[in-house]
Amino acid sequence: MKRILLIALLCVLPLGGLLLSGCKSGHTPDIRVMSFNIRLSPQEDFDGDNCWNNRREAVIRMLESAKPDLLGIQEGYIVQVDYMDENLPEYGRYGVCRDDGLERGEANAIFWRKDRFEMKQCNTYWLSETPDTVSLGWDGACRRIVTWAQLSDKLTGKDVWYFNTHFDHVGKVAREEAGKLIIARIKEQVPEGDVVFLTGDFNANWDNPILDPIRAELAECRETALITDKEGINTYNAWGEKNAPLGADVIDHIFYRGVTAERYEVLNGDYGVPFISDHWPVMGTFRF
C-alpha cells in the first residue's frame, strides 16, 4: 500500500533539519524553482525506447545536477513519483492523483529541499466549477488539478507559496477559466506580502492570451529574468520528432511574485539518454 497516510501527515507536521550553508554573508539567498513534465508512464513499455524505465536514472542525474530548491512535476503516475521520492531523499514530497484524489491517474507532485523549507500546509484542488471535489472542468478532456503548499523558508524566515498545475490540452474554455480560478484562489489564500511561485505545463505558448489573467498578477520568469532565453528554446521537444520553430512550443512556465528573477534556463543538456522526457525542464533562479 502506498504512503497516502504518510503524505497527509507531511502536510501538517514540520520537517526537521537546518540549512547551514548556501548563503554568503551579507547576501540574500537564491532560490531555484523547476517545472518539469516528466511524461506519464501508465505501463512499463509506454513510449517504447523512451519509456520511463529507460529514462528514470537520467531524470535523477538531471535533478542531482540542477539541485532545484522547489520542483513541480506534471504527468507523474504513482510509480514514477514513488521512484523519484525514493531516489531524492533530501526532498520532501506532496501530491495526489487527479482521478480520485489518491493514486489513480496523473499527479502534479511538488518536491522541496528539507534542509531549506519546512512544510506548513498543503492541498489539492480541481480546475473546474467545483474545485474542492474530484471533477472535470468546463470543456476539458481530462481532470486537471492544482497542487499547492505553503512553506517556511529557513534561511529568510519568509513564507513561500508554491502552486503547480497542468492545463488541459484540448479545452480552450478550460484553459481560460483555469487561469482565472488559480488567480482567484491565490488572492483568497495568500497574504499580500508573501512570495508566490506558480509552475506548470500550461499547454499554451508564452504569448497566448489565455495566460493574460495570470500575467496580470504574476511576472513570468522567461520574460523578466536578467539572464534568459528570449530566443525561445522550445520546452516541448516531442522526442525530437516535431522540429518546431524556435519559440513555437514554449508551453512550460514559471510565474512569480515577491522576488527578483535572476536567471531562466531550459535544461536541454545531455544526461545520458536522448531525451529525459518529451518536455525539457525549465528552471528559474530568484533572489529575495
Report each predicted region and the residues it spans.
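N-terminal, active-site-proximal structural segment of metallo-dependent hydrolase catalytic domains
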Residues: 19-87, 100-105, 180, 288
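Acidic/histidine-rich helix-loop elements
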Residues: 35-57, 127-141, 168-171, 239, ...
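Bacterial Sec-dependent N-terminal signal peptides
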Residues: 1-29
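Short, Asp-centered acidic motifs that coordinate Mg2+ and/or phosphate
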Residues: 31, 69-70, 160, 195-197, ...
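Metal-dependent phosphoester-hydrolase catalytic domains
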Residues: 173, 177, 184-196, 203-288
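Active-site metal-binding loops of divalent metal-dependent hydrolases
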Residues: 36-38, 165-167, 201-202, 280
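Structured beta-strand-rich core segments of catalytic domains in phosphoester-bond hydrolases
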Residues: 70, 74-159, 163, 266-267
